[in-house]
Amino acid sequence: MSYFAGEFDVAVIGAGHAGCEAALASARLGVSTVVFATDLASVAMMPCNPNIGGTAKGHLVREIDALGGEMGINIDHTYIQSRMLNTSKGPAVHSLRAQADKRKYAERMKHVLETTDNLHLKQAEIIKVDIEDSKVKGVLTKNGAYYKVKAAILCTGVYLKSRIIIGDINYEGGPSGLAPANMLSQSLIESGIKITRFKTGTPARINRRTVDFSKMIEQKGDENIVPFSFMSENIEREQISCYLTYSGDETKKVVLENIDRSPLYNGSIKSVGPRYCPSFEDKIMRFPEKDKHQIFIEPEGENTEEMYVGGMSSSLPEDVQLKMLRSVPGLENAEMMRTAYAIEYDCIDPTQLELSLEFKDIDGLFSAGQMNGSSGYEEAGCQGLIAGINAALKLQGKEPLILKRSDAYIGVLIDDLVTKGTQEPYRMMTSRAEYRLLLRQDNADLRLTEMGHKIGLVKEDRYERFTKRKTAIEDEIERLKNIQITNKQEVNKFLEGLNSAGLKKPISLYELIKRPELNYFVVKDLDKDRAELPRDVQEQVNIISKYEGYIQKQLEQVEQFKKLENRLIPKEFDYKLVKGLRTEAIQKLDKIKPVNIGQASRISGVSPADISVLLIVLEQYNRNKGHKEEEF
């Protein structure tokens, strides 16, 4: 028996990293929003790794922040260590990574939700999304409360019909001992949504007091802290070290002797796990030539002795896990506080979604995060942000925010999921982005804050700070272009001291910086009138000047890319009427329903020849609009 419990514009189902960003975006855009969590103690919980960012993931966090999301600000307030990764490589792959105090991270995010206007946080399990005539009408809780809503966003994480697996033990359950959500999947299936099943896992947690750090390599945080959020300032604080050790022959021996007890290798686990975050036993079996593997020992917070054993995710039995741990240098006496486990869960085929993250066939139903087949807090957060924005924009009668592959890593991620689908938990990587020199983490605000302001999520204080930074960068670049460096003896002597050839004729300082051995910082002595600019402005000026030629080439590639993206395909276009398209192409195009030729060209099973046919036919179609039954 159900009862009417209230009415909201948007319901967000789940309050993990996707749900938090979705709910905040929706509410901040002025629509009444309710977010449901099965347990309010689990809001923004970090059930796996205790960090935010990393390679490519740091880019996503910067982009979330640039659009007006919360993740970057939240980690800046709660980090216990911060490092910029890949600094020996080019700026395109520099990625910020911060170790989080897991409890403080979750507590602060929950408080932000609780104190946001238009946002209501409730503890309840949603068992049904009420859909009538392919349109969302409401949601029903396990306790019988019915909420009338105009849009709903699925952010269920790994909780749908989740099953914990440890050796030959398996039981229904969610991460960190929380209950699974067993009833919602069936409701979605009954609404025509295709459900699949994925697997992920997490390592053991061990007691800090039982670790011998003297046998490990200490990894300290950076001395100069770079914040995730463009709004954060002066966030330096005392940091806590992480440690690196390695597995060895004994660890390998333990795994091989017990591989028949691994659910991955004895047939107990049939679902697909993440390729780029394999379990430890999977590493041993897939890379038999490797004698050792990195193991990272990471603190989970300031006020806990729990340490995360990074790189040692496992579904082996508890007794084997303990032997495995104690074979690692520094962990000979390790006490396991939490067991590693694998978890299987229901998720959707993301090709059922539009690029707005709304279901193609269900008006008002959106989906974000691990529900869409992705993995990771950052991948979840950025999808939640886009789904929340687009749910609000839809209800306001506005066009959705669609980020292109040339706009953001978020655009790459969503396009990959929606256009290609995924056969395994999808992880963001820099190699997935064709235009990664343009999509750097340092220029996320320059790429996206204007968009965030236009839709109303970026408020005036942030926008004012953004325009000030943008102007400072542009003015400094213009100034450098107007400074002429002459071929005086003292100038050439200075350059030779930097192993750079002397000048034969005058050159602008902007052009001089382009030399491989020089940069904006080392030529300071040639620039007597240089003002003291913020470090982030100086970094941006240096990157733009040094890489201008490469950046220009990528911009030209983007222009070519846009030509295909601008060739729109009408929603009503019938591929079955097109002569010359292969059967596989017709089936794939009909399923994905690409919005333009660019997206069509990225669909697996659609060849360049199919695209050529499609381009010719679309021109004819546009000339003869209205003749839908005509064959082409």
UniProtKB/Swiss-Prot annotation:
Chain residues that bind NAD(+): 273-287
Highest classification ranks of the organism: Bacteria, Bacillati, Bacillota, Clostridia, Eubacteriales
Protein name: tRNA uridine 5-carboxymethylaminomethyl modification enzyme MnmG
Cofactor: FAD
Key word Transferase present: no
Classification via SMART domains: GIDA_assoc_3
Similarity field: Belongs to the MnmG family.
Residue positions binding FAD: 14-19
GO aspect biological process, one term: tRNA methylation
Gene name for this UniProt entry: mnmG
Species of the source: Clostridium novyi (strain NT)
